[in-house]
Amino acid sequence: HTSDQHRWFQESRRSRDNPRADWYVWADPAPDGTPPNNWLSIFGGSAWQWEPRRGQYYLHNFLVSQPDLNYHNPAVAAQMLEECEFWLRRGVDGFRLDAINFCFHDPLLRSNPAKPPELRKGRGFSVDNPYAAQVHLYDNTRPEMLGFLERLRAVIDRYPQTMTLGEISSEDAIATVGEYTAGDKRLHSAYCFELLVDRFSTAHVREVIESLERRSPGYWPTWAIGNHDVARVASRWACPGVPTAARAKLLNAFLLSLKGSTCTYQGEELGLTEAELPLEALKDPYGIAFWPTFKGRDGCRTPMPWNDAAPQGGFSA
C-alpha cells in the first residue's frame, strides 16, 4: 500500500479515467450500496472505504489511510520493481518485506468463508478481532505472488551480496514460507508469527521447529521471537520466580542456537520489558480499536534506554 496522501492515490481517487485510475484496488458497490464483499481490515471494520468522487470503494487491508496498490496492473508491478532497483543502485544491502503476502488479491473479489470458532487464533491479531473469524483465501496469499517474487529476485540477483527477507502472516504460514523461498528463485529467507505467540510453550516451540524442518527441508530459516507488532518477549514469556535478566539471556541463547538467521528486535538483547500504557496514552489506532484484549503496539515501540535510571532514558533530547 501507499499513504492516502501519496500523489498516486490522490490522482487515482479523482476519477475512473485518469492515468492512475487502475493503480489501486477499486470496486463498485453491491446493489444495496454496501462493500463488494466481506473482506475485513486487520485493524477493524471493513477492508473497503467509500470514495464519492469515483462512486467506488477502495481496498485497504490495514488502515483506511493505507490504500492497497493493484499489483494485477502490470504498470504497478513494474513501478514497484523500479522502486526496489532505485535503492539497490544506491547501495542498500537488501529489503525486509513487510506483510509480503498481501500484495495480490482475488480479481473476482470473492468473499472469504467463515472459520469455525475452534480454529480461530491470533497471529499478529487478537482472537476477539473479527478478522480471526474468516478463512483468508481471497484477500491475501494469492498464487500470482509467486511470479512477482521471481521477478523481484531477478532484479536483486543483479546486485551481489544483497538479500530479501519476507514477513509472512497467512492461514498456513509455514507452508507459505516454504513456497515463497522455494528453489533459490524467490525470497532468500522469510519468517512468520509462529514464535510470536502470547504464551511460552515448549511443546509449541518444538512443533514449530520440527514442522518447518519437515515441510521445508531445503529452506534457510529466519527466526524471531519478538518484533514491533507484539508485546516484548521478556514480558510476553515471563516466568514467575525467574528474574527477567536471566530469562532474557536464556531466550537469546535459544534463538541464536537455531539453524538459520535471526531477527533481534531492539532492546530484546537487554531484556527490555513491555511499557504499560493506559488507554488515554495510546497512539496506535490498532490498540485503541481493540482495547483492552489487545493493547496495541505502543508498549513495544518505546525507545531502547541508554540508561534507565537517568532522565529521558539517558538521552540528552
What are the functions of these language-model segments?
Residues 99:
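Residues that line or immediately flank small-molecule/substrate-binding pockets and catalytic motifs
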Residues 93:
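Receiver (REC) domain switch/active-site residues of two-component response regulators
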